[in-house]
Every structure is written in C-alpha cells, then in structure tokens.
C-alpha cells in the first residue's frame, strides 16, 4: 500500500503558519515512506471562500518549498481537487446513508434548534441535537419532503457506549458516544458539511494517513462512524499538537502574526521558517537546530513528535533566521535582498510617494525607510492627542483592524473608504483621526500618505503594525472587547438605529 497524505486548507483567509506546519509534517511523513503528498482545497463554505485566498495559500506553500504531486493547480488522477467542483458527488453518498438507515432527515428550523439549546442550557445540560428527527414516521417524512419543506440530513450516532480509535501519537483514544452530536451531513442548500466531504474525498483520493491538528480529535468518532457506515477502511489518524503562543495559549493573530506572508514580507527566509516549523514538537536525532527540508525527510520519525504544545516564539524564529543568513555568501545574500523587494510595482509606488518630498536621492532613505523596516519605533506618548481621548485612539485602532481584516480587496480606494467611514461614524474629523495611523504605520506624523502606505506594505504588515500600536496604547480587555464589538457594529448602522449593548 502506497502512503498518501494530504493538506486540505480552507481558502477563507490569509495563509496561516499552522497550515504550513501541518503540511510540512504530512509531506515529510509521505516522502519518508516513499509516498505521495497531495493538496485539496476544502471550499464548501461558499460564503467565506475566495479565489484570492486560495491563490495566496498555494503561493505561500510553494514559497516555502512544500510541493505536492496532485492538486488544483497541477491536476492528478483524482481530480478535481476543489470541493466546490465536486458538489455533485456528495449528495448521493448522503442519500445512500439514508437508504442504509445510518442517516435521517431533520426538518427543525433554526429557531426551534435555538430554543432546544436554550432549554438544555437552562437545565444545566450540554447543548446538543435531541434526535427529534428520528421520531418522525416514514409517512410524515415523505409528506414533508414532497411539500418541499427545508431540511438537512443528519448522521445517526449511538446514544451509549465508548468510541475507540487508534492515533499514531496517542495510542488508543476513547470518547463517550454521549459527547458526540448527530452531525449535519447535508445542509438545507444541498451542500455538504466538512465532515461528509472530508471523509468521502479522503476515501476517493486513497488517503492512507491523516495528520491533522488535535482540534479535530472530537470529530474523529463522527469520521470513524462514517467510514463504518460506508464500509470503507479508515485512514490511520495522527493528531498533531497545536502551535501555541509563549504564554501557552493557542496561537492567534492577536498575540503573534500568524500569516505566512507576514514572515515573508519582513525578510524571513523560506528555509528558516520551514526549519523552525520542523522544530515545533519534533527534533533531529542528533538534536541539531539548523537543518534543511531534505535533512528532515531523511531522518523523519513521527514518533519523535512531542505532545506538549510547541511554542511559536518569534524571537527564536528571528535567531534561527539569522543563522541561515550568516550561512550565505555575500553574493547569495545580495541575491536574497534583491529578490525580497524586487516587485517593481511596489518600488514604483514607493517612488511615487516620496518623489514630491525629496530634493536629493540620498533623502529617499529617510522617507522610504519605514516601508522596509519590520516595525517602527513608537511609544505611547507619541499617540497622545489634544483632540482625541485615549479611549478614542484605542477604539479607532481596534475598529480599523476589525474592518480592514474583513476585506480581501486591498487597494487605496477600499482602505481609504474604510478609514474615512470609521472617522465619520465616530464623529471625529479626519485630520484628528489619522495621526494615530501615521504613527502606527510609519512611526511619525511626518510621512508619505498613510492610506497609500498601508496598501503598499500590504495587509499583513499593516495588521501587525496596527496591533502593535494597539498593544502600546492599551489593547482592550476581554470585557471591553465585548462592548467594543457591539459599538463597532452599531456605528455602521444609520444614525436612528442602535444595537442592544446590554
């Protein structure tokens, strides 16, 4: 049996270092066993999935050197490799489960399910589906289907007993069936949920080993049941430890930049980032810290993965990147520097911004430096304003982050409109609103136009600089966050409308 592993990202955001981490271990496991590593795009969430996100994911993984033998961009014997192009496949499998008695129709409305969960919580119970669809007679089901009532298809789950499955790192895992919900397999719009599409595709694409994050452990019983219901062999499971911040919390963009593009943009070498991800819970047999992808594949043993949450420490990554830089010849370093900022359009944008401000070419260094720096040197005192209160400064930065993060169209028109709308909704004059953004992005109020600067440096560096500025002036507490989220939404409403802030 040929080993086949896969990475199956969802194109709903910027490419995450966690995706690269899981992809790396899947690739090493497959190659160490003489197998194949494939890439599949799981874009069943049609509302949030975008072609731009998919392309960024493919580009960032390629940049790292994580190459796949089958995928949406290279094809293969199991094409298509986008779930959105496989939609005709899944419904029949869901209907087959109905025929075999392993799944059932549910006609409960969203309001009925909300009421069900509220009543369960009031009784001190963990909210879960109560099986009401199982109580319907065949005649009633057929009548409601014929009437065209909206419905979903759910899988049946045992009410008692223990689900047992083996994990490469954890041995035998036991999860009570009482903790497993009757998962929706096919939604009211006829589209599959992650669980159905994932299992069907892994089987049809002959995946033999599934290496994924440990957050999917609670889903393993559902997947095991589906494999049993279909009569298929289940792939060997391996749930990898999650990457964590230095404070041991789950890695999140609030505390550490998580986009692969961010690390590329600040000048981390792809070999160094891949090397660092390879050290996340794993080590070379000789404990060396600097190694290549080829080295890792050659010496890879999944049993060397530690289940302790690996810490993603940016300072350690920077140190390791320094080791890789120091190993280059001066000529190689020059090539890397030139390729790092070689995009002619970006350089033209910078030249356009600084041209009205310089009389000598040598003056370009001072005006353009912040475009290339990792982070500007800023202090809390720099954000003190005679026009805005400290809370207004903090809120303007946080609200801008939230609104900008929701955009995939990153151009001057979009960024400018978001910031101008926010200033207007907060009832702040634009000339009083913008200094905080000049300081956060450029480190000074004397700078090139900041909205265009944000476009030029790109979303990842923009978010990182805005978050750092927010940390310096005072990031919101958990209690404040809840209030601010509602306030931010209420600001978007017409002046005569409000939201409940209780």
Swiss-Prot record:
Motif residue range(s): 'HIGH' region: 9-19
Record motif 'KMSKS' region, residues: 250-254
Any single Gene Ontology cellular-component annotation: cytosol
Pfam (any one): tRNA-synt_1c
The keyword Ligase is assigned to this record: yes
Class of this enzyme: ligase
Entry binding sites for ATP: 253
EC number: 6.1.1.17
Keywords assigned by UniProt, alphabetized: Aminoacyl-tRNA synthetase, ATP-binding, Cytoplasm, Ligase, Nucleotide-binding, Protein biosynthesis
The reaction(s) this protein catalyses: tRNA(Glu) + L-glutamate + ATP = L-glutamyl-tRNA(Glu) + AMP + diphosphate
GO molecular function: ATP binding; glutamate-tRNA ligase activity; tRNA binding; zinc ion binding
Primary residence: cytoplasm
Gene3D superfamilies in UniProt: 1.10.10.350, HUPs (3.40.50.620)
GO terms of biological process kind: glutamyl-tRNA aminoacylation
Compartments in which it is found: Cytoplasm
Similarity annotation: Belongs to the class-I aminoacyl-tRNA synthetase family. Glutamate--tRNA ligase type 1 subfamily.
Subunit structure: Monomer.
Free-text function comment from the UniProt entry: Catalyzes the attachment of glutamate to tRNA(Glu) in a two-step reaction: glutamate is first activated by ATP to form Glu-AMP and then transferred to the acceptor end of tRNA(Glu).
PANTHER family reported in the protein's UniProt record: GLUTAMATE--TRNA LIGASE, GLUTAMATE--TRNA LIGASE, MITOCHONDRIAL-RELATED
The protein's name: Glutamate--tRNA ligase
Provenance organism: Acinetobacter baylyi (strain ATCC 33305 / BD413 / ADP1)
């Amino acid at each position: 049996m040929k080993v086949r592993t896969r990475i199956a990202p969802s194109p709903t955001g910027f490419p995450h270092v966690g995706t690269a981490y899981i992809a790396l271990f899947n690739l090493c496991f497959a190659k160490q066993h003489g197998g194949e590593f494939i890439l599949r795009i799981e874009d069943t969430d049609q509302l949030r999935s975008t072609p731009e996100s998919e392309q960024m994911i493919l580009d960032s993984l390629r940049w790292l050197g994580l190459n796949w033998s089958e995928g949406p961009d290279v094809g293969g014997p199991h094409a298509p490799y986008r779930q959105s192009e496989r939609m005709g496949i899944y419904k029949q499998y869901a209907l087959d489960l109905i025929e075999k008695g392993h799944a059932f129709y549910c006609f409960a409305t969203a309001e009925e399910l909300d009421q069900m969960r509220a009543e369960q919580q009031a009784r001190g119970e963990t909210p879960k589906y109560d099986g009401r669809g199982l109580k319907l007679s065949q005649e009633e089901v057929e009548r409601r289907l014929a009437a065209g009532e909206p419905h979903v298809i759910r899988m049946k789950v045992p009410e008692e007993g223990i689900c047992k499955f083996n994990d490469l790192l954890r041995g035998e895992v036991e999860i009570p069936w009482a903790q497993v919900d009757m998962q929706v397999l096919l939604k009211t719009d006829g589209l599959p949920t992650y669980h159905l599409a994932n299992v069907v595709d892994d089987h049809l694409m002959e995946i033999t080993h599934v290496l994924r994050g440990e957050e999917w452990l609670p889903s393993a019983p559902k997947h095991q049941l589906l494999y049993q219901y279909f009569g298929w062999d289940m792939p060997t499971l391996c749930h990898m430890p999650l990457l964590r911040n230095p404070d041991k919390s789950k890695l999140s963009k609030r505390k550490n930049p998580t986009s692969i593009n961010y690390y590329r943009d600040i000048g981390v070498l792809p070999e160094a980032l891949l090397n660092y991800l390879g050290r996340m819970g794993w080590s070379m047999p000789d404990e060396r810290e600097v190694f290549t992808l080829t080295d890792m594949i050659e010496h890879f043993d999944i049993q060397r993965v530690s289940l302790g949450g690996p810490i993603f420490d940016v300072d350690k990554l920077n140190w390791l990147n320094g080791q890789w830089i120091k190993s280059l010849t001066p000529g190689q370093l020059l090539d890397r520097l030139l390729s790092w900022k070689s995009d002619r359009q970006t350089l033209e944008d910078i030249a356009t911004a600084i041209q009205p401000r310089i009389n000598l070419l040598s003056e370009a260094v001072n005006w353009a430096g912040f475009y290339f720096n990792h982070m500007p040197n800023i202090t809390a005192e720099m954000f003190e304003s005679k026009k805005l209160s400290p809370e207004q400064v903090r809120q303007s930065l946080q609200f801008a982050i939230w609104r900008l993060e929701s955009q995939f169209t990153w151009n001057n028109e979009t960024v400018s409109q978001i910031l101008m709308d926010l200033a207007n909704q907060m009832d702040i004059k634009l000339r009083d609103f913008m200094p905080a953004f000049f300081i956060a992005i450029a480190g000074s109020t004397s700078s090139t136009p900041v909205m265009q600067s944000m476009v030029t440096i790109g979303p990842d560096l923009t978010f990182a600089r805005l978050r750092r500025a927010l940390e310096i002036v005072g990031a919101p507490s958990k209690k404040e966050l809840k209030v601010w989220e509602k306030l931010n939404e209420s600001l978007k409403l017409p002046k005569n409308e409000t939201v409940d802030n209780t």
